[in-house]
Amino acid sequence: MSNSAAGRLNQTSHILNESIKNDDISLRRSQPSTTSLQALEHPFKVTVIGSGNWGTTIAKVVAENTALNPHLFVSRVDMWVFEEKIDGKNLTEIINEQHENVKYLPDIKLPENLVANPNLIDSVKGADILIFNIPHQFLPRIVSNLKNHVGPHVRAISCLKGFEVGKKGVQLLSSYVTDELGIQCGALSGANLAPEVAKEHWSETTVAYHIPKDFRGEGKDVDHKLLKALFHRPYFHVNVIEDVAGISIAGALKNVVALGCGFVEGLGWGNNAAAAIQRVGLGEIIKFGQMFFPESRVQTYYQESAGVADLITTCSGGRNVRVAKHMAKTGKSALDAEKELLNGQSAQGIITCKEVHEWLETCEMTHEFPLFEAVYQIVYNNVPMKNLPDMIEELECIAD
């Protein structure tokens, strides 16, 4: 190992140790059970914006909890659906009649209090909590349509994975929602493959929410206790923290790493290569967070479901791995592979690697993130996948 590489390793270890030592982690398992929450004078109305497989799955989780906790929530949960025809019939009609999203989450029975709504503005009418769960490239348009239809009392949770890159630089999607709509927005992310959660196989997730300065008081506003009551299920265990930046960064960048894992898997290089990609990827995720979002906590990447656990799960399967593997085996482009495999849904790593590249190029720092840059070059500039190890090694040497 070179002296510079050893120095970087020691520096990373020092950052991790200091972060864990100095952070107050007493909050980690402090949330009480939902039975300790007092009945609210005005129960919260919840709307889910998005109806893909993850959007529908989260809507199912939330609707189960609103029905079970009428002292906290209005039972009815609206789910905004981008209307489309299935065998000549509106998807919203099918969902509301059959209580099943036959296109994006087939064979999963949905709660009867979950109502599909094709009208975005109507779906958020009277809502106190918005849950955004759409492909992140559509967020600006959705937010633009919601302006003047969402009051300042509303709170939000983003389940989106990605960044907004613009005049303000690289921005968390939760921050984008806050800036554009004037409402406090947290995030949900974790080792959660939608089909497994929908089938009620046990898993964990992380919800991050920072209590705003205009907090109206317990029982009158959204806090950590209420969020746990909204999302926690016997099969879906929730930990609520404040590190919105940390879980958002991990949730976005893991998809880029997963593309790299899909490439080496498709090339038949085996588990050693996949482990190497994940090792480099985790380091770059942490480095990106510390460099551009210093408020993020290093311990989040190691201790939370939204961190290394999500990275492992995503790199073991999921959309991004499938698309990248298909690219490696067929020679097709990322967009063609996505179209063939995903039934109208998105592999978010394809867009995220471009956003990250554009930001790093602006900062003249692409060499600091060799895996992210290599994935971008393979996806957008048709660089041969077999060059991946050399690209990582070459850029690591430049960074030294």
From Swiss-Prot:
Keywords: NAD, Oxidoreductase. It is an enzyme of class 1 (oxidoreductase). NAD(+) binds at G50, S51, G52, N53, W54, G55, F138, K161, A194, R319, Q348. It comes from the Eukaryota. It catalyses: sn-glycerol 3-phosphate + NAD(+) = dihydroxyacetone phosphate + NADH + H(+). GO terms for molecular function: glycerol-3-phosphate dehydrogenase (NAD+) activity; NAD binding; protein homodimerization activity. GO terms for biological process: carbohydrate metabolic process; glycerol-3-phosphate catabolic process. Substrate binds at K161, R319, N320. Its EC number is 1.1.1.8. Pfam families: NAD_Gly3P_dh_C, NAD_Gly3P_dh_N. One of its GO terms (cellular component) is nucleus. InterPro entries: 6-PGluconate_DH-like_C_sf (IPR008927), 6PGD_dom2 (IPR013328), G3P_DH_NAD-dep (IPR006168), G3P_DH_NAD-dep_C (IPR006109), G3P_DH_NAD-dep_euk (IPR017751), G3P_DH_NAD-dep_N (IPR011128), NAD(P)-bd_dom_sf (IPR036291). The active site is at K254 (proton acceptor). Belongs to the NAD-dependent glycerol-3-phosphate dehydrogenase family. This is Glycerol-3-phosphate dehydrogenase [NAD(+)] 1. It comes from Candida glabrata (strain ATCC 2001 / BCRC 20586 / JCM 3761 / NBRC 0622 / NRRL Y-65 / CBS 138).
